[in-house]
From Swiss-Prot:
PROSITE patterns with a match to the protein in the record: RIBOSOMAL_L21
Gene it is expressed from: rplU
Designated name of the protein: Large ribosomal subunit protein bL21
Superkingdom of source: Bacteria
Keyword presence, Ribonucleoprotein: yes
Keywords, comma-separated and alphabetical: Ribonucleoprotein, Ribosomal protein, RNA-binding, rRNA-binding
Function text: This protein binds to 23S rRNA in the presence of protein L20.
Species of origin: Parafrankia sp. (strain EAN1pec)
GO cellular component, one term: cytoplasm
């Protein structure tokens, strides 16, 4: 069974046991996180109806905070000697998916 969840403006296809990096979330390592924005669930059949997805819960455990790849920014203006170099590394929260509950009895 897998689910498609939205976090940080991105969509992630997750299954139980998957480790996924999402935009930075608050929470200490070992804390439980609920991912409420479920867009699709695939079990015995694919579910994408909004009413049925309202009862679906995807739970995950915070593994830690990791940094993404270094991005180098270089601004340059011709004939003036202007150079500006800057770098950036985005922080991500690493999650391990612990459960997908469909809410069916």
């Amino acid at each position: 069974m897998y689910a498609v969840v939205a976090s940080g403006g991105k969509q992630h296809r997750v299954a139980v046991g998957d480790v996924v990096d999402v935009e930075l979330l608050s929470g200490e390592p070992g804390a439980a996180v609920n991912l409420p924005a479920v867009l699709l669930v695939d079990g015995e059949s694919v579910t994408h109806d909004a009413d049925a997805l309202a009862s679906v819960e995807v739970t995950a455990e915070v593994v830690g905070v990791v940094k993404g790849p270094k991005i180098r920014i270089h601004k340059f203006k011709n004939k003036t000697g202007y150079h500006k170099r800057q770098g950036h590394r985005q922080k991500y929260t690493r999650l391990k998916v612990t459960g997908i509950e469909t809410g069916k009895a």
